[in-house]
């Protein structure tokens, strides 16, 4: 079974992005799933990563070990994917990331523990705008090169 997981960015505006990606790729997968973040419903400004990792774990617990998982994630969703993978919650066969805000995550999400990036072993392609208003491209590129395992191609 080939399953697609969509992890949108932090802002509730990214829900529409996730739904569009889900709709676009739905026919190419046996199953699709988009995580709806709790803070979108409560009105809080940012996601609580540990809570969202648990929601991913609950979702995938019922899936067969033979499920082939692809993750498409945007911004904070990419950070969430890195954390969930590092914690062994999910083991995708490939990932596609759009805009990874490592500069924002270094203190708040990773707390200068870069093991989710250093130990990352999933073939991944990442896209990042040169003029990204949220996450600096140069910092993202440098972080992937210096702290990454070599599995994320920017």
Model regions and ranges:
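Conserved serine/cysteine hydrolase catalytic core
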Residues: 107-123
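Active-site loop->helix "elbow" adjoining a glycine-rich segment at hydrolase catalytic centers
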Residues: 74-78
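A conserved short beta-strand
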Residues: 90-103
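Short beta-strand/loop motif that positions the catalytic acidic residue
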Residues: 120-121, 125-128, 132
């Amino acid at each position: 079974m080939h399953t697609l997981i969509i992890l949108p960015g932090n802002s509730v505006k990214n829900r529409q992005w996730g739904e569009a990606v889900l709709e676009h790729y739905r026919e190419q997968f046996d199953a699709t799933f988009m995580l709806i973040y709790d803070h979108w419903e409560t009105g809080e400004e940012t996601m609580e990563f540990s809570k969202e990792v648990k929601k991913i774990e609950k979702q995938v617990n019922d899936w067969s070990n033979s499920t082939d998982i692809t993750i498409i994630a945007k911004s904070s969703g990419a950070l969430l994917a890195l954390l969930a993978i590092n914690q062994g919650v999910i083991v995708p066969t490939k990932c596609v990331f759009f805009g990874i805000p490592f500069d924002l995550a270094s203190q708040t999400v990773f707390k200068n523990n870069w093991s989710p990036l250093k130990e990352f072993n999933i073939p991944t392609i990442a896209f990042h705008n040169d003029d990204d208003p949220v996450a600096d491209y140069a910092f993202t590129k440098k972080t992937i090169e210096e702290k990454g395992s070599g599995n994320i191609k920017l």
